[in-house]
Amino acid sequence: MNKEVLKMLTEKKSNSNFVTVECLLAFDKDEDKGRVLTLMRKFSSMVRFAYKSILHGAERKELKKLLSRKYGINTRYSDDAILLAKQNLESCLEGNQNPKKLVFGSRELFEQLKKKHLAGKSRDTLRQKWEERRYGILYSRGDKSREGNLNLRLVNLNNQWCLRVNLGNGE
């Protein structure tokens, strides 16, 4: 199958032109779940790489090509990773924070993880929460000329809404 189909559990309409979806994904196959989680980890890594590259003065056009080659993901995902990286940088600058000290996945959780007194289940739970925030990002914008979002698209299969995910590498 070229595109992964995921069951959609909830949706929320933001206005008449666009749909914002908040959902819990339920997977029919563990293989599908693994592939989507891999895509999310790659995308999260792309955002962090783009952020560091922007700090070092990289240009968007060159960075977009580099990200696509390095991670084996299409340029739409690369462009969106660059957008998120720029938004993170702007947010740091607006908040008068040092952009070089940004911690992806929440500084607060990271600082708690660094404490030596945490052990066992509480540490594992905290680490899982931090990793979900750090690696659990997937963002893709739609395009009017392409009639919506080609990477993430809602489809109705047998009266059930599903999310079709383009894995970014032609699958």
Residue ranges of predicted features:
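Nucleic-acid substrate recognition interfaces
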Residues: 1-171
